[in-house]
């Protein structure tokens, strides 16, 4: 069984929603856990880590476990993880200065308590075109925001000697450029759509983590409708991002 722990926020919720189902459709046993606090930044994860705060909702295989609150240490010690992922909160993702010194400390903490796990950077995506949130970040477009985040995430991965990058952001940026008018990638200004957007990110995670092909995957249990045209589109886009980042995976 492949075991993945994300120290994340709602972006990790979006990205991991379908990973377990995609794996199951491919006959691969997988456990996918997200430690969730909405909008949680690396600085807040760091403070929670120092205080051993049982502040996180526990999402397992895309579903929230009701009534369960965990600390980062609780989660790290709860299983023998194969992968642990880290990410920055989206409003801060373009500014590498906000990553430190928190990222270094969290990475060291993860390696102390989950020494066998590969440590990955989850590269998040840009906001929907036209949202005023882009102006607040002093960028004009989704692509411009993503380019800033991309540079910061590369610096982050290099700094902590990460074992790889999960290129969700790259895939969504590619999809934004190539999608047809009826293809919905965001459900609001910042989050992925419950169908196609989350599916693309899930394929990226699954393909990157397992190095297995995704073209013939039969998963279709979406939270909102995804046409067969969009399924094919998602697989093509995800595969493109996976291949582009394959040289960064150890």
Residue ranges and their predicted role:
Residues 2-3, 11-100:
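Conserved SGNH/GDSL esterase-like catalytic core that processes O-acyl groups on lipids
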Residues 69-195, 207, 216:
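Alpha-helical cap/lid subdomain in secreted, periplasmic
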Residues 185, 189-192, 196-250:
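Conserved catalytic region of serine esterases and O-acyltransferases that act on ester linkages
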Residues 5-7, 122:
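Short hydrophobic segments within beta-strands
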Residues 11, 39, 126, 172, ...:
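Residue-level detector of flexible, active-site-proximal loop/helix-junction positions
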């Amino acid at each position: 069984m492949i075991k993945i722990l994300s120290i994340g926020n709602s972006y990790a919720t979006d990205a991991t929603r379908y990973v377990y189902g995609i794996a199951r459709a491919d006959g691969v046993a997988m456990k996918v856990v997200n430690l969730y606090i909405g909008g949680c930044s690396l600085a807040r994860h760091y403070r929670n880590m120092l205080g051993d705060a049982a502040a996180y909702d526990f999402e397992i295989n895309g579903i929230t476990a009701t009534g369960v609150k965990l600390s980062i240490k609780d989660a790290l010690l709860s299983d023998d993880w194969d992968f642990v992922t880290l990410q920055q909160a989206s409003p801060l993702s373009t500014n590498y200065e906000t990553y430190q010194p928190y990222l270094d400390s969290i990475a060291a903490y993860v390696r102390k308590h989950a020494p066998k796990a590969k440590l990955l950077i989850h590269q998040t995506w840009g906001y929907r075109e036209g949202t005023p949130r882009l102006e607040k970040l002093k960028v004009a477009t989704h692509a411009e925001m993503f380019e800033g985040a991309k540079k910061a995430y590369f610096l982050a991965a290099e700094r902590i000697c990460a074992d790889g990058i999960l290129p969700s952001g790259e895939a969504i940026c590619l999809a934004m450029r190539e999608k047809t008018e009826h293809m919905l990638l965001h459900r609001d200004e910042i989050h992925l759509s419950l169908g196609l957007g989350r599916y693309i990110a899930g394929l990226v995670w699954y393909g990157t983590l397992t190095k297995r092909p995704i073209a013939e995957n039969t998963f279709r249990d979406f939270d909102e409708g995804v046409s067969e045209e969009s399924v094919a589109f998602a697989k093509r886009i995800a595969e493109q991002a996976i291949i582009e980042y394959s040289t960064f995976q150890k």
